[in-house]
Amino acid sequence: MNKTYKLAIVGATGLVGRTALKILEEKNLPNFEYKLFCSKKSAGTKIKFLGKEYIAQELTENSFDEGFDFAIFSAGGDTSKKFSPIAASKGCIVIDNSSAFRMDKDVPLVVPEVNPEDIKLNHGIIANPNCSTIQAVVC
């Protein structure tokens, strides 16, 4: 029997979060359950994803009590700095799209096409460089 993975999308109502959802929809990963999180202001927003209607929920300090395997953070640096360590402390592997951890020596900065092996160095949080850097190192 295949394991089902739980993936939290933080910042799901924003531009980067919606782009992440679009990519995930294109990939149509098997054995994944999704939960969408957003700011208090955007809570209750309905988002069509994978043929279903999801309701984005406010991100709180208790949001990761559900036992997520992974989280994609696309809600800005302040949100990432506050909530990524909470998620990681509960066993969730965080992929952060903000600048919050890019200069942190304990957080690997990963471009999958360039240094995928560095993912193994994570302590619960993985950062990615900004879009200009990614283009420069991939080309």
Question: Where would I find each of the regions flagged by the language model?
Answer:
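N-terminal Rossmann-like NAD(P) cofactor-binding subdomain of oxidoreductases
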Residues: 1-139
